[in-house]
């Protein structure tokens, strides 16, 4: 399964992705995003960790306004 970086305040998303079998990495700094297939951020501050300027392999999903299920669906479609 995919390696997904998830901002630490999104614990429900972390748990749901782990239940689906993904490797979940908590994003505390820009370095945590390296090696991730996809990252999920809150969107409250679109560049809180510099991810917008970082060239990670995968896409960045903004969780703002989405349910946990919708976020998981986006992760599945992008990995």
From Swiss-Prot:
Organism, per UniProt?
Answer: Bacillus cereus (strain B4264)
Q: So which domain of life are we looking at?
A: Bacteria
**Organism phylogeny:** Bacteria, Bacillati, Bacillota, Bacilli, Bacillales
Protein family according to the UniProt entry: Belongs to the UPF0180 family.
List membrane-spanning regions.
none
Protein name from the UniProt record: UPF0180 protein BCB4264_A1446
Q: Which InterPro entries match?
A: UPF0180
């Amino acid at each position: 399964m995919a390696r997904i970086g998830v901002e630490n305040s999104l614990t429900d998303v972390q748990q749901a992705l782990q239940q689906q079998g993904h490797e979940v990495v908590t994003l505390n700094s820009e370095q945590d995003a390296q090696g991730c297939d996809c990252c999920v951020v809150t969107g409250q501050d679109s560049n809180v960790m510099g991810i917008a300027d970082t060239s990670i392999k995968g896409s960045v999903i903004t969780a703002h306004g989405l349910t946990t299920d919708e976020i998981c669906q986006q992760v599945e479609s992008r990995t």
